[in-house]
Amino acid sequence: MAARSWQDELAQQAEEGSARLRELLSVGLGFLRTELGLDLGLEPKRYPSWVILVGTGALGLLLLFLLGYGWAAACAGARKKRRSPPRKREEVTPPTPAPEDPAQLKNLRSEEQKKKNRKKLPEKPKPNGRTVEIPEDEVVRTPRSITAKQPPETDKKNEKSKKNKKKSKSDAKAVQNSSRHDGKEVDEGAWETKISHREKRQQRKRDKVLTDSGSLDSTIPGIENTITVTTEQLTTASFPVGSKKNKGDSHLNVQVSNFKSGKGDSTLQVSSGLNENITVNGGGWSEKSVKLSSQLSAGEEKWNSVPPASAGKRKTEQSAWTQDPGDTNANGKDWGRNWSDRSIFSGIGSTAEPVSQSTTSDYQWDGSRNQPHIDDEWSGLNGLSSADPSSDWNAPAEEWGNWVDEDRASLLKSQEPISNDQKDSDDDKEKGEGALPTGKSKKKKKKKKKQGEDNSITQDTEDLEKDTREELPVNTSKARPKQEKACSLKTMSTSDPVEVLIKNSQPIKTLPPAISAEPSVTLSKGDSDKSSSQVPPMLQDTDKPKSNAKQNSVPPSQTKSETNWESPKQIKKKKKARRET
């Protein structure tokens, strides 16, 4: 009974297992049919249970066998890979080329020939038309000898660098250079900036120039603290007078300008040569020579900065200096000047004879107005149109001639005739006042007519001034008050030039001693007598009622001139404010 029960239990378990296997097989076959479209024609329900069990057991064994075989193959492959490099070396080394094989001998010879061709030196001259045969030992030994000679050369170079640079790292560099037989130095380590002897000399010269400039400032008492220039408006003034070029005095050939800049960035260089440059932050400024005419500026400096440009030749410069202001046929007016600098009122107040006092004074005002522009021609941009642009000549920056003495002499001369002219003008006024009540009614009518003509002339000049101010470029905006001043003086000069000179004489006395004024256009007693003697009698008669009419028309012109004379004070205040900022 017990044995049967044991067999029955096995049978029941086998049937249960087979039923599960059948279900799995049916599911797998259905999956193959639906997904892959494979129909194996197997029906697990038809087969008995023992067949299914045997089949599944066999499949399990196959799977185990395949897994074990794959694992063994993988392990064997890994072992082969680990042992493969030494085996390959052993296999490569034993088959050394035997001298008996002809193919291997040919290959070896061809390789040796290639090596020889690479190592061959350039052919030496052929003795008697035959090439020199170089043995193989020499060909092989030459690069070795070169490599053996290279290390001592590098050691010598390193020793020199030790002496010059005195570095502790030079030993390490010597080891590196000796280890490398290429013959090339390695660019490593800290680089040092060396200053050449030439640069040191230049620096010493600059320092000497700076120290000399301080001593020159102390030696020249009249030039100290005359010019204050900011870094924004760097200009220096040279004051040439006359055409003399004497170089006797060292004080006269050295130009010193004292700078008071708020920023303190400007450095001063004073040289005794023909050219002088002021370097500010590395930039060079060429100087512009400025003439100060007592008729135009009336004691006010006119500073203009000019950008560096190629200047004109000396021929134009000499012609500019030697030209007379009263020469009507000279070329001074047509030198490519801007329209802002041209004389606009050259014909007003002039008659057919150019001998009368009014015409000469008019033209002298025009000449004095044009004179600063003559300096522009040979020192600035405007000279490019007339001069040769390819010339290397630069404008001289220093004063020519004994300008200090001439300056003082001209001031003394100008003050003496001005005092005489004041007396003459006072006498003329008294005579005119005495003649006014004693004159007849006809003379009064003539005076009124001429007074109206003078007023119309002044109105025309004012209209022309307004038109020209509108047409002038923006660059001349700073010089407008000075132009108005000159124009007002011009209208006064057509009637009576003596009073103009009296007005101009007042600011001349307040000028600093370092600024040289041109010889002012003055009419002394002797000159006035000569000019009056040369004038025909008709012109002299016409001049007397003009002077009488001038006294009637003085108040409007004087009020205009007073308003114009107030403007320079405002301009000076503005300039002081700019310099302080």
UniProtKB/Swiss-Prot annotation:
Keywords: Acetylation, Cell junction, Cytoplasm, Endoplasmic reticulum, Membrane, Nucleus, Phosphoprotein, Tight junction, Transmembrane, Transmembrane helix
Location, primary (coarse class): endoplasmic reticulum
Molecular function as annotated in GO: double-stranded RNA binding; NF-kappaB binding; RNA polymerase II-specific DNA-binding transcription factor binding; transcription coactivator activity; transcription coregulator activity
Name of the molecule in the record: Protein LYRIC
Modified residues (N6-acetyllysine): 263
Organism ancestry: Eukaryota, Metazoa, Chordata, Craniata, Vertebrata
Region annotation (Interaction with BCCIP) ranges: 72-168
InterPro entries reported for this sequence: LYRIC, TransReg_TumorExp
Modified residues annotated as Phosphothreonine in this record: 142
Tissue/organ expression: Widely expressed, with highest levels in liver, kidney, prostate and small intestine. Not detected in endothelial cells.
Cytoplasmic topology ranges: 71-581
Interaction with RELA: annotated segments: 100-204
GO cellular component: apical plasma membrane; bicellular tight junction; cytoplasm; endoplasmic reticulum; endoplasmic reticulum membrane; intercellular canaliculus; nuclear body; nuclear membrane
Lipid bilayer topology: Single-pass membrane protein
Nucleotide-binding listed as a keyword: no
Biased composition regions of type Basic and acidic residues, renumbered to the chain: 108-126, 421-433
A Pfam entry, by short name: LYRIC
Region (Lung-homing for mammary tumors): 380-442
Residues modified as Phosphoserine: 179, 215, 250, 297, 305, 310, 343, 368, 414, 425, 456, 477, 493, 495, 567
Composition-biased stretches (Polar residues): 318-331, 353-371, 382-393, 519-535, 548-567
Domain of life, source organism: Eukaryota
Disulfide cysteine pairs (residue numbers): none
Region (Disordered): 77-221, 280-581
Lumenal domain ranges by topology: 1-49
Membrane-spanning residues: 50-70
Subcellular location: Endoplasmic reticulum membrane; Nucleus membrane; Cell junction, Tight junction; Nucleus, Nucleolus
